[in-house]
Structure formats: C-alpha cells, structure tokens
C-alpha cells in the first residue's frame, strides 16, 4: 500500500474543494433542513419528499441508477406523534420542542393527573421502585430525574405516565418501533416547577406497522475497473416532526453528510475514478441503522467486489479535526488517510476509534466490507437532536478540507488485481 500511495500522490493536485463546492453543499443542507421537508421523518412523509429531492439531485449531476431505479424501498415499523402535543405542570403550559418532548413510543392520552415526584440518585432505579412498592399509581404520573433507559421502555411503576426531568432535551426515534401503554415525557428542569402537583397532557399518536421508505442510490461507472466498487454513504433521514408544529431540522445530523456525498457525486460524475463509485443516501438510520442493514442484506452491487465503504455523518463542524470510527481496527487504511492529510493538511487532526454500531458503516463492516465512519469535531457547533440544529447556524468549518481528503482517499485506495 505504501508504494501505491507514493506512486499516486505525485499525480494528485493538492487542493481541497472549491468555494463553489461548499456553496453547492450549503444549498442542499438549506433545502433538506427546511420545514418543507418535515425534518426528514415519517409523519407527513418528510423522508419520502427528501428521497425524491435526492433522486433529482443525483440525476441532475449525471449519475445513473443501479438497475432500473434510484430507489431501494424497504419497510419499517414506526410510531408518530401527531396533532398538537400539550403539557402543563401545575397549570402552566410548557412549550413543545424547547421545554418538553414526547417520547416516540408514547400512546394517545388526554387528561389531568396528579403527580408523585421521586427524588433520588439519577441512576438508582431500584430505590425508586422500593419507594413506590405496593402503591396504586394507575391514575398518577411519576416525575423523576432518573436517567435509566428502562423508564422509556417499560411501565415499571404501573403508573399513568412518566415525566423525566432533564437538562438536555434530546429527541430520539429509535424507540418508536412499538407503542408503550403509557406516555413518557421529557421536561426541561429549568421549565418545570420545583414541586409538581398536577400534569395536564394531550398526546396523539399514529402507529405504522409497515411504513415504506427508501435508500437512494446512484452510480458513476469506473473507467478501468467498473466491476470493482467503492461506496460513499450518508443517512438523509432525521427525527421528523413531533406533532404539527414542531420539526427537527437536522442540519448537522445529517443533512451535512448527505450534502457532501451529493457534492462528491457531482465531482466524480465529471471526473470518473478507475473503479465504480456507488453513492447511497440511507434512510432509517435514526430508527436503528435499518436502511444500511437492509442494504447489507440486499446489496445492489456484490459485497465481495466492494473495496471500501466510507460513511459521512455529522460533518458540520471541524475546528479540532475529524474522528474515524474503525480507524483502530483497519490500520492500513487509517495510515493511508493520515498520510494524505500529512501531505496536504486537509484537516487539523485525525483521531481514531474502534468498532461502534453508531452509524451506517456498521452492517457493511460486519458483512465483510472494510468501512470507516467519519465525523467532525469541535465546540463551535454542538446542536444535536434538537430543534436548534438549523442550516443557518451550521459553520461547515472543515468542509473543504474533508472533501479533499475523501476525494484523495477514494483515488488512492489500492485496487486488488
């Protein structure tokens, strides 16, 4: 690999993306993170609207479908929070999205209930259960700062509902595959009264047992080895809507990565690589990596002919560099990446991690395809899984450098004969 690196390094122009490239990506981020695309979720078909937009984007760049279509459809089970969620504590209404969140596995409920507040160590679930043992809480909400994940998945108190008091209002959809028998609501500690006596709540849900969503895939054929493939991937889905009035833009996570693979697709459509490049915008990453898992089980090109898969997720910052998941377990590929960066100083630093099932590289790697997941690092932008992850605040600090690094890595990957 070292000989290949130095052979090809002399042929590369040491430049990152152009300002026009970053502007192109920012336009895509602005579109995908706009309210028109509904947070790219499943209530009001935001994910489907986004898939159609990306198909058009790939086509306009001159890419071709794999087989007869750009779409690879599959089904997921998902619960959606619809209508207008409402929450009032001691009679004072809280603002949805910024002061409270409704867990994605919550059922329809409406009414006013008394509240039992349990003050105990945040992770000590056994103490909470001991305090409530033998009590009839069927018409009572439990309010607690306990952070045990079980509270979002099981009705351990046999209560009417649970209010989780938290400093960080992060929303997730990975628990939306089924519906609990009670609602779970996250409320901001600063928005909640010191003593909660009553809760008035209104939640509506709609459960989809088999919602059809789609991966979006497009190809640039290789000039010398068209039957060898490199995958460039990012998930385009996000959290969607919590009712009619609140949506989660998802600019950093992951309109940013989606925009870069669209930008790379445009570049390689005009400058084809020796091997074929497959660009895949995955759906249903936020629900549990379901889109990439489906692809790994139903690949559009042979996995044994896939040389590498590079996944981009959360790349809107970068003041301190990037981190590479699987960098520790694929040292030769990581050495290639760092050698390219040392030559061109594309990003400030490249950190590495081991295996992690935290993005769409995972199931490809587990099915035998060498794979990296790259994300940017830096404190200049920290919005995550909330209503403030918007396009207008996204700095794209390391965008140009990361573009150049990924482009060169694709061109320098060794091609087995």
Model-derived regions: residue spans:
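N-terminal signal peptide c-region/cleavage motif recognized by signal peptidases
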Residues: 13-15
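N-terminal hydrophobic or amphipathic helices/low-complexity stretches enriched
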Residues: 17-65, 220-222, 226-227
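Noncatalytic luminal/extracellular "stalk/propeptide" segments of secretory-pathway proteins
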Residues: 38-145
